[in-house]
């Protein structure tokens, strides 16, 4: 079966998604992409999991979906996924979330929706990065100055130097990005009651392995799998091993 591209209206916004039909008796796989990415990134993985019905969405602001109709918070993205599941009447859903998509998966799974049966977090974000004291001081000093129009180019250089390329990549989503990264999901992890698989790249620099271990300890029914010779996009670096772990867990 081919992967079909479709659209749906959710909360007044067009949401683009990709769908491949599989065994109707098997669990449904719902893939959530990371920041600056889109649903297409999962197509190779979906192709290797052809026995399952699979969906991958473009979050509002990414891919071919509409921009958010306001400055989104993580809860808004969680509601988009929840409404997507309801509108398509999906049951026995397994969410597979990468990076930012993992954040959304954590947020939704912590509310124990009956439609979700399992959760797979892939190099997931969600543990808030702790700024060191120097960065906090610098931020307090330069934030008011940054607002001056003639310092726009300087602002971009400093943001890049501080590792905030995601902030610059999607200017329409800058406040949304700030809302997202400022939310620490640590307190939600113990509320996840469904079986959870953590798949992590051994050399992930964006979501360090220490975050994976924190999540494994906090989520009651969880297991961590570390893929060697992989980075933040472990499912791209080692697709075959990634897919094999999915099949074992599902």
Residue ranges and their predicted role:
Residues 192, 198-200, 204:
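Short beta-strand/loop motif that positions the catalytic acidic residue
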Residues 230-239:
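Catalytic histidine-centered segment of alpha/beta-hydrolase-like enzymes
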Residues 1-29, 50-52, 90-91, 132, ...:
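Alpha/beta-hydrolase fold catalytic core
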Residues 20-64:
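Conserved HGGG/HGGXW glycine-rich cap/lid loop of the alpha/beta-hydrolase fold
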Residues 18, 55-96, 244:
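Active-site loop/oxyanion-hole signature of alpha/beta-hydrolase fold enzymes
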Residues 103-111, 117-148:
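Flexible "cap/lid" loop of the alpha/beta hydrolase fold
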Residues 159-187:
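Hydrophobic, aromatic-rich cap/lid helix
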């Amino acid at each position: 079966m081919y992967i079909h591209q479709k659209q749906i209206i959710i909360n007044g916004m067009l949401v683009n998604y990709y769908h491949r039909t599989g065994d109707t008796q098997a669990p449904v796989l719902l893939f959530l992409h990371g920041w600056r990415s889109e649903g297409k990134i999962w197509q190779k993985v979906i192709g290797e999991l052809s026995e399952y019905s699979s969906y991958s969405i473009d979050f509002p602001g990414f891919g071919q979906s509409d921009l958010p109709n306001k400055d989104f918070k993580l809860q808004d993205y969680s509601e988009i996924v929840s409404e997507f599941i309801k509108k398509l009447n999906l049951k026995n859903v397994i969410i597979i979330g990468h990076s930012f998509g993992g954040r959304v998966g954590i947020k939704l799974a912590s509310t124990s929706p009956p439609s979700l049966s399992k959760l797979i977090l892939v190099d997931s974000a969600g543990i808030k990065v702790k700024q060191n004291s120097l960065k906090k001081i610098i931020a307090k000093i330069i934030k008011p100055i940054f607002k001056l129009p003639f310092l726009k180019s300087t602002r971009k250089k400093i943001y890049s130097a501080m590792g905030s390329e995601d902030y610059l990549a999607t200017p329409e989503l800058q406040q949304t990005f700030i809302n997202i990264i400022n939310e620490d999901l640590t307190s939600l992890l113990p509320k996840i009651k469904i079986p959870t698989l953590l798949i992590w790249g051994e050399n992930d620099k964006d979501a360090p392995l220490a975050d994976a271990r924190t999540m494994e300890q906090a989520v009651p029914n969880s297991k961590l799998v570390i893929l060697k010779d992989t980075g933040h996009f472990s499912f791209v670096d080692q697709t075959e091993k990634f897919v094999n772990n999915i099949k074992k867990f599902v």
